[in-house]
C-alpha cells in the first residue's frame, strides 16, 4: 500500500469519531459503519476531502471512478475539487447505454458491476483513481478494478475511507492495483 500523504493520527481520530457504529444492521451479527454522520459533519467531511485532494493533486488524474453507492459521495466530490471527470461504477442493469460487466462472489451467491463502454470517453492512456467508502472482502473493489482495466486505462490507485483489515480485501486488491486506505478498522 502506498505511503505518500498519509493522514496523521489526530485527523484519523476525528474521522473515526464522526462515523457512527450500528450493531446488528442490516442483519444480526453485522457491525455497520454509518458514514452519513461523517457526510453531515462539515468539519470531518472537509478534513477528509482536503486530505484526499492533497494526496491526489499530483497524480495527474483524468477521472475518478466511484463504486455504487457510497463511493459516489467521495468520488464525485474529489473529482469536482480536482476539476476532472467522475465515472460511476454501477450495479448491473443501472446504466442505460452499452456496458461491460464483471461478476463477483458474495457470501451467498454472486453480483455484478458494470461500466459504460465509453465511460472514459474512449480515451486511452488516461489515469483513473477508484474510490469507495469501505473495503471488506474486496470482491466489489476487485470487480470494479478489473472493469476499469478492461477499458485500457491506467488504474493509478484504489482508495477507501475504511479498510476492515482482518478480512484481507485490501491485500487481495493490491495484487492488481495499488491500494490506499485512509482508516484501518
Curated annotation (Swiss-Prot):
This is Adenine phosphoribosyltransferase. The keyword Transferase applies. GO terms for biological process: adenine salvage; AMP salvage; purine ribonucleoside salvage. Its EC number is 2.4.2.7. Pathway: Purine metabolism; AMP biosynthesis via salvage pathway; AMP from adenine: step 1/1. GO terms for cellular component: cytoplasm. The lineage of its organism: Bacteria, Pseudomonadati, Campylobacterota, Epsilonproteobacteria, Campylobacterales. Keywords: Cytoplasm, Glycosyltransferase, Purine salvage, Transferase. Transmembrane segments: none annotated. InterPro entries: Ade_phspho_trans (IPR005764), PRibTrfase_dom (IPR000836), PRTase-like (IPR029057), UPRTase/APRTase (IPR050054). Its main location: cytoplasm. Catalyzes a salvage reaction resulting in the formation of AMP, that is energically less costly than de novo synthesis. One of its GO terms (molecular function) is adenine phosphoribosyltransferase activity. It comes from Aliarcobacter butzleri (strain RM4018). Homodimer. The keyword Protein biosynthesis does not apply. Belongs to the purine/pyrimidine phosphoribosyltransferase family. It catalyses: AMP + diphosphate = 5-phospho-alpha-D-ribose 1-diphosphate + adenine. It is found in: Cytoplasm. The gene is apt.
Amino acid at each position: 500500500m502506498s505511503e505518500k500523504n498519509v493522514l496523521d493520527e489526530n485527523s484519523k481520530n476525528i474521522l473515526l469519531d464522526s462515523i457512527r457504529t450500528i450493531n446488528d444492521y442490516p442483519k444480526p451479527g453485522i457491525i455497520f459503519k454509518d458514514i452519513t454522520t461523517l457526510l453531515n459533519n462539515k468539519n470531518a467531511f472537509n478534513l477528509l476531502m482536503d486530505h484526499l485532494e492533497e494526496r491526489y493533486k499530483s497524480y495527474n488524474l483524468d477521472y475518478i471512478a466511484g463504486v455504487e453507492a457510497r463511493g459516489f459521495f467521495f468520488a464525485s466530490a474529489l473529482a469536482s475539487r480536482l476539476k476532472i471527470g467522475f465515472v460511476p461504477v454501477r450495479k448491473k442493469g443501472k446504466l442505460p447505454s452499452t456496458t461491460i460487466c464483471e461478476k463477483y462472489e458474495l457470501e451467498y451467491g454472486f453480483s455484478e458491476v458494470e461500466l459504460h463502454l465509453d465511460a472514459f470517453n474512449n480515451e486511452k492512456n488516461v489515469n483513473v483513481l477508484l474510490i469507495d467508502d469501505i473495503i471488506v472482502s474486496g470482491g466489489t473493489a476487485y470487480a470494479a478494478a478489473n472493469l476499469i482495466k478492461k477499458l485500457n486505462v491506467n488504474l493509478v490507485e484504489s482508495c477507501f475511507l475504511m479498510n476492515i483489515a482482518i478480512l484481507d480485501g485490501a491485500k487481495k486488491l493490491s495484487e492488481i492495483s495499488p491500494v490506499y486506505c485512509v482508516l484501518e478498522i
